[in-house]
Curated annotation (Swiss-Prot):
This is N-acetyl-gamma-glutamyl-phosphate reductase. PROSITE patterns: ARGC. Its EC number is 1.2.1.38. It is an enzyme of class 1 (oxidoreductase). SMART domains: Semialdhyde_dh. Signal peptide: none annotated. Pfam families: Semialdhyde_dh, Semialdhyde_dhC_1. The gene is argC. One of its GO terms (biological process) is L-arginine biosynthetic process. The keyword NAD does not apply. CDD domains: AGPR_1_C, AGPR_1_N. Belongs to the NAGSA dehydrogenase family. Type 1 subfamily.
Length: 334
């Protein structure tokens, strides 16, 4: 039995983590924590998230001393802001904890990336160099050896799962960059109230055009440039990405299908469509990424869907934890 701590437990992702870990037979939740200044400190997690009533009825504690909180803890999940994770992760790592960071603080091994896209100077480049990017289906062997696992972003997870098999099989024409148009539910903006995400204001619209921090994350880990445009959708949760690519001359629909089959036939949390493309409702509330595609000559359109809070965050973090400690990969997830 491993003792685990969730920091940032009051948010949407933190609540999903708590639910997964509470029903995991190998995990014992020692505490649910939030920042010392949080208005949620002292409240029951089940009062903040009523779906947890009768399941997890424990208070959310303020984190005032990370070194003290680390005592007796084996595994830490950081569902916190990027700068908060940047500051906290090294403390828990120094205490010997295995850390799964759901922020962007350790995803890209380039200090300039953080200055440009996150607005802070990275002070822990030693841990940045050691961090393993936790794209579970592709980095399992590295995850097994890691102490710090940087869980990929929600958009990058779906984009990479859709594109990596095609790039590895050299099916795409590199003269045309993949174009990723992605729509996410409002929960992707977090639980904190804002005008943009309020019920009467939310509307389908693009944002972060040419400067969203997930574009360089996707490009870096794919090893190829992409054009990425995220959109805010007028629904609560889920991500749908429509990706337009150009195939190499002579590549057939069967070649594309075989590339996906070879990559994911033994990966239980990626579901492939033999015909048609997935809809958002097929994944909301579930830990899967669903992928379908269509080919017309040299043109390829791939559609990938996931729940942004699950496969795009909490479920992938727990999947990586299962891989790291040798548990069944889908334990507590399905």
């Amino acid at each position: 039995m491993l003792n685990t701590l969730i920091v940032g437990a009051s948010g949407y992702t933190g609540a999903e983590l708590a639910l997964y870990l509470n029903r995991h037979p190998q995990m014992n939740i020692t505490a649910l924590m939030v920042s010392a200044q949080s208005v949620d400190a002292g409240k029951l997690i089940s009062d903040l998230h009523p779906q947890l009533k009768g399941i997890i009825d424990i208070p959310v504690k303020p984190l005032t001393d990370a070194e003290e909180a680390a005592k007796g803890v084996d595994v830490v999940f950081l569902a916190t802001d990027h700068k908060v994770s940047h500051d906290l992760a090294p403390i828990f790592l120094a205490a010997g904890c295995t850390v799964f960071d759901l922020s962007g603080a350790f995803r890209v091994q380039d200090a300039e990336f953080y200055r440009r896209y996150y607005g802070f100077e990275h002070q822990h480049t030693d841990w940045l160099a050691k961090a393993v990017y936790g794209l579970a289906e592709w980095r399992a062997e590295s995850v097994k050896q890691a102490q710090l696992i940087a869980v990929p972003g929600c958009y990058p997870t779906a984009a990479q799962l859709a594109l990596k098999p095609l790039l590895d099989a050299q099916l795409l024409n590199s003269a045309q960059w993949p174009v990723i148009n992605a729509v996410s539910g409002v929960s992707g903006a977090g639980r904190k109230a804002s005008l943009t995400s309020s019920f009467c204001e939310v509307s389908l619209q693009p944002y972060g055009i040419f400067n969203h921090r997930h574009e360089p994350e996707i490009s870096t880990h794919l090893g190829t440039p992409v054009i990425f445009t995220p959109h805010l959708g007028n629904f609560a949760r889920g991500i749908l990405e429509t990706i337009t690519c150009r195939l190499q001359p002579g590549v057939t629909q069967q070649d594309v299908a075989e590339a996906y089959h070879n990559a994911y036939h033994d990966k239980p949390l990626v579901r492939l469509y033999d015909k048609g493309v997935p809809a958002l409702k097929s994944v909301v509330g579930l830990p899967f990424c669903d992928i379908g595609f269509a080919v017309d000559g040299e043109h390829l359109i791939v559609v990938a869907t996931e729940d942004n809070l699950l496969k795009g965050a909490a479920a992938q973090a727990v999947q990586c934890m299962n891989i790291r400690f040798g548990f069944p990969e889908t334990q507590s997830l399905i």
